[in-house]
Amino acid sequence: MDKGDRGILQIREMATELLKNAGCTAHLKIKKQFPGGRLVGGKYHPHTHTITLYTETIRRQCELLFGSCKWFMPYATIVLAHEIGHAMDENLPALSAAFEESGRLPEKQALALTIEQNAWDFAGRLVPAHLRPLFQKIMDESLSAYRQPVIAGAH
């Protein structure tokens, strides 16, 4: 078994445990990169109730935020916890519908922030205490992209 196979196996074991702890029945896919080149580490697909983790994209995010891949597995755990947060969000269908129906950019931005904040709130309950500082940094970095337009639109 090579290093890549061990890494995938580690991720699958971590994911199985995290999904079980969350009571989440979503299916898991593991791929290398998010299509189109954007730095998306994970994606929840509500129509198929599937979470996809993008390992090389997560690795790149980890390098950009922390300067190395030292925190890769904890980072992947946090990304998965966030995606589980989307999967477990009972308000996601209504929020997504409101997002799609809205023609106003400020409203869309506020809805996107709510969707992301809900997922992070749920994820925070899944992440072990020893990963809290790392979780906080990743969450803050992720949410800043959603908060900035909302704050700018409020002024």
Sequence positions of predicted segments:
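Long, well-structured alpha-helical subdomains associated
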Residues: 1-6, 43, 72-74, 107-113, ...
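A structural signal for well-ordered alpha-helical segments within the folded catalytic domains
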Residues: 9, 75-78, 82, 117-121
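Short, flexible/disordered intra-domain loops and linkers
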Residues: 3-4, 62-70, 103-106
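Post-HEXXH active-site segment of zinc metalloproteases
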Residues: 90-121
